[in-house]
Amino acid sequence: MTQNLSQLEHNDAFIQRHIGSSVEQQQQMLAAVGASSLSTLIQQIVPADIQLPGPPPVGEAATEHQALAELKGIASQNQCYKSYIGMGYSPVLTPPVILRNMLENPGWYTAYTPYQPEVSQGRLEALLNFQQLTQDLTGLDLASASLLDEATAAAESMALAKRASKLKDANRFFVADDVHPQTLDVVLTRAETFGFDVIVDRAEKVLELDGIFGVLLQQVGTTGELHDYSALLAELKKRKIITSVAADIMALVLLTAPGAQGADVVFGSAQRFGVPMGYGGPHAAFFACRDEFKRSMPGRIIGVSRDAAGNTALRMAMQTREQHIRREKANSNICTSQVLLANIASLYAVYHGPQGLQRIAGRIHRMTDILAAGLQHAGLTLRFKHWFDTLTVEVKDKAAVLARALSFGINLRTDIHGAVGITLNETTSREDIQTLFALFVGDNHGLDIDQLDAAVSQHSQSIQDSMLRRDPILTHPVFNRYHSETEMMRYMHRLERKDLALNQAMIPLGSCTMKLNAAAEMIPITWPEFAELHPFCPPEQAAGYQQMIGQLSQWLVQLTGYDAVCMQPNSGAQGEYAGLLAIRRYHESRNQANRHICLIPSSAHGTNPASAQMAGMSVVVVACDKQGNIDLHDLRQKAEHAGDELSCIMVTYPSTHGVYEETIREVCQIVHQFGGQVYLDGANMNAQVGITTPGYIGADVSHLNLHKTFCIPHGGGGPGMGPIGVKAHLAPFVPGHSVVQIDGMTTQQGAVSAAPFGSASILPISWMYIRMMGADGLKQASQVAILNANYIATRLKNAYPVLYTGHDGRVAHECILDIRPLKEATGISEMDIAKRLIDFGFHAPTMSFPVAGTLMVEPTESESKVELDRFIDAMLAIRAEIEKVAQGEWPLEDNPLVNAPHTQAELVGEWTHPYSRELAVFPVAGVLENKYWPTVKRLDDVYGDRNLFCSCVPISDYE
């Protein structure tokens, strides 16, 4: 035995599981790029003046089992009381078939946003089902594929109302006084930057006001009152005021659709359809509007189109509305949505079907009626006479009732003056009702549930007759076909097989960091201790969450060089918004509200200008030089011209051109010299961790894409997390929360998300990653990511020019391949190459960003040299195919590239092409052993946008 115990223990380290290439493979790649070691390579690439003098103090790595045991101990400090708090969050019963086959399945959670529809037809179908579900329940024409949460959706509805309003001089937005407090909180934050006046009052008071462009109502008020707003909606329509209604997705199963009553926009949380509370998230919001507002609608929309063979195919529709194209003119800065959670909700509806949903909603309402009847029989007073699932019970000694509730292991809503709130849910049992009777009336209450049931079933008037739904819902066959577990399992597997995720192949998308989402990182998110807590439960019941979030925050502080971290933003784009708000509020606190100009390099992510616009700033673009670096002369000139109106600069590092700019510290100094702040976009943190930090570079604030650098999976387009790190002077200006005091934060600022810690239940993923990697592992991950990118660039540069490199001819963690010379010479485009890669079993790199006519490749540290070589071989084989087109061997209009991707149906059909079937589908030998088969040919984008159809198609189209 030549190894000692320490060496044997090290061999069990997670680091070697996460990093795809062995030490021997790394040496081979280093030799190929001309570097002797990883540290030497980093010294050559990263500017010396920004390299950290030592590793960040995040501790040593733990093994998978050690980290899981440690986190389990922390989670055990959480106390899972029975939650009747409501306020938009309810306990659920996630069908095990969905839990196991979707939420715990890497074929679903490791996929990327479906920008490449040919490899995304499965999740696109599930999202189309979500849109159909939303349209049916809301009674409106068009639905989005999800938004970040209900409160964000409310803010987006206000923005839509202003964009679409014909009352151009109106600047007031009215909010009914019984919307959820967290919803109002986020609306007020958004209105602050837009300069809107928000009026909060009883709903009927809106008719007494002038200058109103939009109204927000809540169908089932936050304290439970069920409203019939049909008359009010009709009157507001006459006045050309755009109306939005917040709705409960479960209540909509039984209630009249707000769209049928005249609402223009309807939104809410889909959490109750199978998604655990998770201490606040992640949850998908649904959002629907009338067809006339489709161009103003926020978020992604799935549309039905056709492929090159004329067959039905799905795609993201109207993408020209999105922030990466319209930039500061975009409808919204939303980039990440909540695809995984929307798909759970849609499959919950598919599995239960309309009858099952009506049974669940009906049971919840019946239980509420029984509870109400029993409490009233015992002499208690209810504040409202119409309800769905929530009762406001007036009590004389509120403190005593709440103390007794805690002794029963029960959480009630506590913030209602002179009363408590009780919201029932699908987990509520007969025994729970008996316990509630005992809580309010006493152990000897003498109330019989069956007798109460008989009475209320005959005489219930808790739902007004005018509010009872009479139209059928979910009539499409997809909601009426898969109700046995066997059928449901097979349906989900059919959808999964249509998609390409990380469990099949590398996803080399530039600026997306599609790294391993390890099983050990994912396991804790379904633990009840994390999954079943209400975000507004008493803080002492969430001690485990507080410890875990506190540790993760401290690690992120150490890894970013900042002084504080705010966990609230639910996505990178929302983090940008929150960071810019902090800058804006900081300037205002210094009586410098005039500082409104945001400088943004021309290479920036499209979210940057969209977020700046949302934060009430004016965008001024800074030029880049021929090497892709920020033009310092132009920057200084524009900063000086902005003068005391300069608010900040938004810069990405390494740049979106895939290089470490040598002058990044000078960029920061110039902006600071003129009184501005530096926002460093954290999209490319995977090339910084352990090597440098934004704080060390000189930045003031950054968001961190936990779904990139810190291993939260992309989920097919969400969830994501975008916490912000800030220097001390900005810490008082990060988002706060109106319901929950955030420990360690002195901020009194408005919220940007519904929950105080955003999507808290996925934070254990990043906690596990950092704990298992340790300081050395995190640095090594960054180093290997940089090595992998340089290896690809070195091997491909003679076939495809690398557009931007540093002074030493090297790239950072990603490289941009310039396809423009090939396109000019041969007619073959970056699109053709991207689609041909599908035949080789790869997802395409990022197309035409940040430069049109290019492919941006980011191989993460999780990919092995074997997989990198497979990708390189595919790209070289494609280059050889392009050469055959150039030489006239294949015509431009009929070759493997322009016809890609090739399907099984095409393979067995009539073959008239000048190349073989084998070359079409098995272009290199390695494809044969793990062939991915696309189910559709190339999408017809023009047809899809000219023929917008965003509902479920006939089932025969899927067969």
Swiss-Prot record:
Annotated organism of origin: Yersinia pestis
Keyword check for Plastid: no
Annotated catalysed reactions: N(6)-[(R)-lipoyl]-L-lysyl-[glycine-cleavage complex H protein] + glycine + H(+) = N(6)-[(R)-S(8)-aminomethyldihydrolipoyl]-L-lysyl-[glycine-cleavage complex H protein] + CO2
Name of protein: Glycine dehydrogenase (decarboxylating)
Enzyme class: oxidoreductase
Entry-linked InterPro entries: GcvP (IPR003437), GDC-P_C (IPR049316), GDC-P_N (IPR049315), GDC_P (IPR020581), PyrdxlP-dep_Trfase (IPR015424), PyrdxlP-dep_Trfase_major (IPR015421), PyrdxlP-dep_Trfase_small (IPR015422)
The UniProt record lists the keyword NAD: no
Gene (UniProt): gcvP
EC number(s) from the headed UniProt entry: 1.4.4.2
Cofactor entry: pyridoxal 5'-phosphate
Similarity field: Belongs to the GcvP family.
Cellular component per GO, a single term: cytosol
Protein function: The glycine cleavage system catalyzes the degradation of glycine. The P protein binds the alpha-amino group of glycine through its pyridoxal phosphate cofactor; CO(2) is released and the remaining methylamine moiety is then transferred to the lipoamide cofactor of the H protein.
PANTHER family in alphabetical order: GLYCINE DEHYDROGENASE (DECARBOXYLATING) (PTHR11773:SF13), GLYCINE DEHYDROGENASE, DECARBOXYLATING (PTHR11773)
